[in-house]
């Protein structure tokens, strides 16, 4: 019988007013990929932070190689052979590949870096991962996928036996994902212990040997024979309902045309786009990488310059030269890159909610109306069901789903008519996705015109009244909800001929 190499035994972690983990117990084995799944807020990140030495457990034991260990800091975890490859990669773009790989462990003699040994050591690990990259290349010249490979090389150079991946494919292209999986398979064959955190079911089934599910900081179950379970089994384990139940689509009466785009193009939008969205309608935009969906939303929102065409709102032609113009007309955007463009990471939940409407409620122009801000932030927090101990909490401490709900709450402080959602559920767990879908339908019931861009085909079919399909900055077709199938929509996303209707 195989002996576990890594074991969590009744591990708990508490923060003031919050029990993040309660009695988590499971085992991981050498030469296996052990997936960790659960909704945002289930406790996955907290568990990784205990494993990496960022947090001390409040209770429970952690055993590695049969030895009970307590990591008081990240250095102790590294010395024990633990490496975490976080979603936010720990790299210095201005430094070279070699300098990043050996950061903190630069070979030196009499205080002078031994460059020859630095290059030789780096090349050894680049060769191991079959990376055709020069050790002298600055990281800023490489792709995110290559950055991730450097992080893996760094882990191997430090003798890591346990390697945990936190949402590793969220920013990778298809070829980069294939490369990552190839490397993970090699590490498994070498007897490494791999922990793999992801929301992507197809990845989990493809790469994992075992799956442990957490919910609300508690252990639910471990699946050891993946041939006997389905997507629905996993979803039920995580959220207590079937996969098909998460959309909750309901038909509604739509009004007159609210948003009309005619022959629109922009500096980064190399096409000629015309579309309409009615009050109370959800229009889905689907297309493969490079289709131009995000570029279209940014031109409508004024984030990218409009070159030609017109935008009408309720029959009135608008002049939108900036996001400020769009917001003042009632058009708002929740951007694709939530962390870079959607939130202010150094600000609280309340400040992020109020950041747009603040100008309407301040005394004069520069004096903040604290009473209104606190009341509004709390109101939107409750309306959006943002899970946070307090509106004073830094927004970066929230899960992706709760960050997205806070961004939606920001716009509900405005008098909005058109809501543009770019990949609204990217990096969000199944339970939080269902809440976002409910919010979309609730806003549609209030007669907002809504455009949803999504790369998730079941999602775009599940939430939309109509689906407009794009390819290479052209509209290739429009499909009514009643006629929408994955095959039909995907075919339109891959054809070259233009075949459009409003």
From Swiss-Prot:
GO terms for cellular component: plasma membrane. One of its GO terms (molecular function) is ATP hydrolysis activity. Gene3D superfamilies: P-loop containing nucleotide triphosphate hydrolases. It is a peripheral membrane protein. Its main location: membrane. SUPFAM superfamilies: P-loop containing nucleoside triphosphate hydrolases (SSF52540). Part of the ABC transporter complex AraFGH involved in arabinose import. Responsible for energy coupling to the transport system. The gene is araG. Belongs to the ABC transporter superfamily. Arabinose importer (TC 3.A.1.2.2) family. Keywords: ATP-binding, Cell inner membrane, Cell membrane, Membrane, Nucleotide-binding, Repeat, Sugar transport, Translocase, Transport. This is Arabinose import ATP-binding protein AraG. The keyword Chaperone does not apply. It is found in: Cell inner membrane. It holds the Pfam family ABC_tran. Its EC number is 7.5.2.12. Residues 6-241, 252-497 form the ABC transporter domain. ATP binds at residues 38-45. The keyword Amino-acid biosynthesis does not apply. It comes from the Bacteria.
């Amino acid at each position: 019988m195989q002996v576990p190499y890594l074991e969590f035994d009744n591990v708990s972690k508490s923060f003031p007013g919050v029990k993040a983990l309660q009695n988590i117990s499971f085992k991981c084995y050498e030469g296996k990929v052990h997936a960790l799944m659960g909704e945002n807020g289930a406790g996955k990140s907290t568990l990784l932070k205990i494993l990496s030495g960022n947090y001390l457990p409040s209770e429970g034991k952690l055993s590695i190689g049969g030895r009970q260990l307590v990591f008081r800091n990240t250095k102790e975890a590294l010395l024990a052979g633990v490496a975490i490859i976080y979603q936010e990669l720990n790299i210095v773009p201005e430094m070279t590949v070699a300098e990043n790989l050996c950061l903190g462990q630069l070979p030196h003699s009499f205080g002078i870096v031994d460059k020859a040994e630095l290059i030789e050591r780096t090349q050894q690990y680049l060769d191991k991962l079959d990376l055709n990259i020069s050790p002298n290349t600055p990281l800023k010249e490489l792709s995110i996928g290559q950055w991730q490979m450097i992080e893996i090389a760094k882990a191997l150079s430090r003798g890591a036996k346990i390697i945990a991946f936190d949402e590793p494919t969220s920013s990778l292209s298809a070829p980069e994902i294939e490369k990552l999986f190839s490397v993970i398979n090699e590490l498994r064959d070498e007897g490494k212990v791999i922990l793999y955190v992801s929301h992507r079911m197809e990845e989990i089934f493809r790469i994992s040997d075992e799956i442990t599910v957490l919910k609300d900081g508690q252990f639910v179950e471990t699946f050891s024979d993946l041939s006997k379970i389905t997507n629905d089994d996993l979803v039920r384990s995580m959220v207590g309902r079937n996969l098909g139940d998460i959309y909750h689509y309901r038909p509604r009466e739509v009004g007159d045309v609210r948003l009309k785009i005619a022959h629109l193009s922009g500096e980064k939008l190399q096409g000629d786009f015309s579309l309409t969205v009615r009050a109370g309608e959800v229009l889905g935009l689907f297309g493969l990488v490079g289709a131009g969906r995000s570029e279209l939303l940014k031109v409508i929102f004024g984030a990218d310059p409009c070159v030609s065409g017109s935008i009408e709102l309720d029959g009135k032609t608008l002049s939108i030269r900036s996001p400020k113009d769009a917001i003042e007309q009632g058009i708002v955007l929740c951007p694709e890159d939530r962390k870079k463009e959607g939130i202010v990471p150094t600000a609280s939940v309340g400040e992020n909610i109020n950041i747009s409407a603040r100008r309407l409620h301040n005394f004069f122009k520069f004096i903040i109306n604290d009473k209104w801000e606190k009341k509004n932030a709390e109101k939107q927090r409750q309306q959006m069901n943002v899970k946070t101990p307090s509106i004073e909490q830094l927004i970066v401490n929230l899960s992706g789903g709760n960050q997205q709900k806070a961004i939606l709450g920001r716009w509900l402080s405005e008098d909005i008519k058109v809501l543009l959602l770019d990949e609204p559920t990217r990096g969000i767990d199944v339970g939080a996705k269902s809440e976002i879908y409910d919010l979309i339908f609730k806003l549609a019931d209030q007669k907002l015109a809504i455009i949803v861009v999504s790369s998730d085909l079941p999602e775009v079919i599940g939430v939309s009244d109509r689906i407009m399909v794009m390819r290479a900055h052209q509209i290739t077709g429009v499909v009514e909800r009643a006629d929408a199938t994955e095959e039909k929509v995907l075919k339109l996303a891959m054809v070259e001929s233009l075949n459009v209707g409003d």
